[in-house]
C-alpha cells in the first residue's frame, strides 16, 4: 500500500522541555493518550531515555502492536523508526518542539508515516490517520499543560 504521511501542529502553553519530558514518559501514555492501550520501554540508552518501546494502540480500524526505535535531540526533537509489529507494516515519525514567546510556549509539530499493510482506500485511511493524529497531539497538549500547571 505504501507509506501515508501526515502532519499536525499546535501551540502548547509550556516550554519545550516540558513537552519533551511528557512525550518521553512512554509508560504513562495509557493514562493520557486516548488511543494507547499499553506502552512498555524494552530497553534504555545510557542517559535513561527509552531506546525501544512497544506500544499497543487502538488504531480505530483495528488494534495494533508495534515496537519503535527512538532517537533524541533533547529538548527540541525526538523521532522514531519501525522495528517490528503486528497489524502494521511500517511507522515512522517525529515530534519537533519550537520555542515561542521566549520559551514560555511551544509550537509542537507531530509528523507520522504509516503503512497499515492492508488495502485501505486512501481517503478512508487519511481520515482515520488525521483523526488519530489530531487526538494524539491534543492529548499531548492537555497532559503537558496539566503537568506544567498551565
What are these regions (language model features)?
Residues 1-48, 150:
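Hydrophobic ligand-binding cavity/cleft-lining segments
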Residues 5, 11, 79, 96, ...:
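Conserved beta-strand segments that form the floor/walls of ligand-binding pockets within enzyme
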Residues 7-11, 65-69, 92-94:
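Well-ordered beta-strand positions in beta-sheet-rich domains
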Residues 11-15, 56-60, 71-73, 83, ...:
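Solvent-exposed residues in well-ordered beta-strands and their adjoining turns
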Residues 23-26, 36, 53-55, 70, ...:
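Conserved short hydrophobic patches within well-ordered secondary structure
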Residues 30, 40-88, 107, 135-150:
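Glycine-rich portal/gate segments that line the openings of hydrophobic small-molecule binding cavities
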Residues 82-135:
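Beta-strand/loop substructures that line and gate deep hydrophobic ligand-binding cavities in soluble
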Amino acid at each position: 500500500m505504501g507509506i501515508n504521511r501526515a502532519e499536525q501542529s499546535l501551540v502548547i502553553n509550556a516550554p519545550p522541555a516540558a513537552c519533551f519530558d511528557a512525550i518521553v514518559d512512554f509508560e504513562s501514555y495509557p493514562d493520557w493518550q486516548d488511543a494507547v492501550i499499553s506502552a512498555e520501554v524494552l530497553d534504555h540508552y545510557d542517559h535513561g531515555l527509552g531506546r525501544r518501546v512497544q506500544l499497543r494502540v487502538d488504531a480505530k480500524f483495528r488494534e495494533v502492536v508495534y515496537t519503535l526505535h527512538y532517537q533524541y535531540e533533547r529538548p527540541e526533537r525526538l523521532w522514531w523508526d519501525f522495528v517490528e509489529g503486528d497489524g502494521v507494516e511500517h511507522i515512522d515519525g517525529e515530534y519537533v518542539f519550537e520555542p515561542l514567546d521566549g520559551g514560555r510556549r511551544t509550537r509542537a509539530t507531530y509528523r507520522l508515516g504509516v503503512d497499515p499493510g492492508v488495502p485501505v482506500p486512501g481517503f478512508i485511511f487519511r481520515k482515520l490517520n488525521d483523526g488519530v493524529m489530531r487526538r494524539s497531539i491534543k492529548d499531548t497538549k492537555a497532559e503537558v499543560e496539566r503537568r506544567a500547571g498551565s
